[in-house]
């Protein structure tokens, strides 16, 4: 299990962008497709405290928000410990 989890759907272009961002930095992540699994949708609602947009990204157990928040966390050095 990775320290990063990306909640996504198959039709979300920003989800693709977020995953590519993590891939480029060599940061492993688990993807949870909420459009394919009802249980994943329930988990998404709880973990993200009712967020209605994807992607939603969890780092070290804390939901940080979407792609913008991911890039801000990276700029602040908050992802450094996850990079190889």
Can you say where each PLM-predicted feature lies in the sequence?
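Local sequence-structure signature of Cys/Sec-based thiol-disulfide redox active-site neighborhoods
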Residues: 1-28
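Short alpha-helical
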Residues: 13, 39, 52, 65
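Non-catalytic, surface beta->alpha helical segment in thiol-disulfide oxidoreductase systems
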Residues: 59-84
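Structural micro-motif
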Residues: 49-58, 68
């Amino acid at each position: 299990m990775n320290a990063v989890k990306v909640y996504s759907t198959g039709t979300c272009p920003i989800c693709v962008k977020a995953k590519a961002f993590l891939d480029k930095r060599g940061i492993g992540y688990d993807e949870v497709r909420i459009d394919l699994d009802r249980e994943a949708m329930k988990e998404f609602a709880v973990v993200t405290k009712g967020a209605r947009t994807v992607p939603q990204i969890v780092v070290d157990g804390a939901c940080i928000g979407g792609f913008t928040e991911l890039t801000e966390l990276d700029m602040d050095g908050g992802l450094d410990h996850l990079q190889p």
